[in-house]
Curated annotation (Swiss-Prot):
SMART domains per the UniProt record, alphabetical: Ribosomal_L2, Ribosomal_L2_C
UniProt subcellular location: Plastid, Chloroplast
A Pfam family: Ribosomal_L2
Region (Disordered): 1-22, 225-273
HAMAP family in the cross-refs: Ribosomal_uL2_B (MF_01320_B)
Molecular-function annotations in GO: rRNA binding; structural constituent of ribosome; transferase activity
Gene that produces this protein: rpl2-A
Protein name per the record: Large ribosomal subunit protein uL2cz/uL2cy
Cross-referenced PANTHER family: LARGE RIBOSOMAL SUBUNIT PROTEIN UL2CZ_UL2CY, RIBOSOMAL PROTEIN L2
Subunit structure: Part of the 50S ribosomal subunit.
Biological source species: Saccharum hybrid
GO biological process, one term: mitochondrial translation
Length: 273
């Protein structure tokens, strides 16, 4: 993609880049308002998720995760910015007049043609069942349950790999390093999600992060003892414990939060790293 490089002495825009091909003009029939209530609070108004609040107003774009336009080719018309996710989205015009948004596959440009269904070519942006894909295929937007829509590998730069097929199940290596089983009847999209370098983007200032709805993160060691187990002491004091803890006293940095008995444990062959 063509990129525009800012050359200014201002820290907020210094060395910043903008994709010239990426626009932000959503279609009216594919967007709707979404009331963001609470912003980290529960029904009683108590903070349950810290560091959330503020943020610019957003319109939700309806993304086609199911890809159920079978055997109808579509053309990429625009590549757009979506404020609700870190991946770009692209507008597809199908041959029957239908218009939908999908996640932008890496390398896809305006004018490319995509299609979904069985026995379709193994090319970037096409969606087909895992049973029709060869081993080693890079995929994203993977279904867990047939017909429910893609739920795995949807973030910017995410890509999974099909490593084995046996019986009715396929073995996938997910971006987290987890190896799990998925039904071969589930759909997946060929390729990698675009906007790969989003994690290397420099926001430049605190205000840019506030626009994203993220509030400042304060270290526990600079708090008072009443607010955090790491707090207190004279001057620049250590945490005073053998291991770091959360604000509620539980072990931090490596504590597993997944439920011990979950229905999907039998489908996970290797835990994530």
């Amino acid at each position: 993609m063509a990129k525009h490089l800012y050359k200014t002495p201002i820290p907020s825009t210094r060395k910043g880049t903008v994709d010239r091909q990426v626009k932000s003009n959503p279609r009216n029939k594919l967007i709707h308002g979404r009331h963001r209530c609470g912003k980290g609070r529960n029904a009683r108004g108590i903070i349950t998720a810290r560091h959330r609040g503020g943020g610019h107003k957003r319109l939700y774009r309806k993304i086609d995760f199911r890809r159920n336009q079978k055997d109808i080719s579509g053309r990429i018309v625009t590549i757009e910015y979506d404020p609700n996710r870190n991946a770009y989205i692209c507008l597809i015009h199908y041959g029957d007049g239908e218009k939908r948004y999908i996640l932008h596959p890496r390398g896809a440009i305006i004018g490319d043609t995509i299609v979904s269904g069985t026995k379709v070519p193994i090319s970037m942006g096409n969606a087909l069942p895992l049973t029709d894909m060869p081993l080693g295929t890079a995929i994203h937007n993977i279904e867990i349950t047939r017909g429910r829509g893609g739920q795995l590998a949807r973030a910017a730069g995410a890509v999974a790999k099909l490593i084995a097929k046996e019986g009715k199940l396929a073995t996938l290596r997910l971006p987290s390093g987890e190896v799990r089983l998925v039904s071969q009847n589930c759909l997946a999209t060929v390729g990698q999600v675009g906007n790969v370098g989003v994690n290397q983007k420099s926001l430049g200032r605190a205000g840019s992060k506030c626009w994203l709805g993220k509030r400042p993160v304060v270290r526990g060691v600079v708090m008072n003892p009443v607010d955090h187990p790491h707090g207190g002491g004279e001057g620049k004091a250590p945490i005073g414990r053998k291991k770091p803890t959360t604000p509620w006293g539980y072990p931090a940095l490596g504590r597993r939060t997944r439920k011990r008995k979950k229905y999907s444990d039998s489908f996970i062959l290797r835990r994530r790293k």
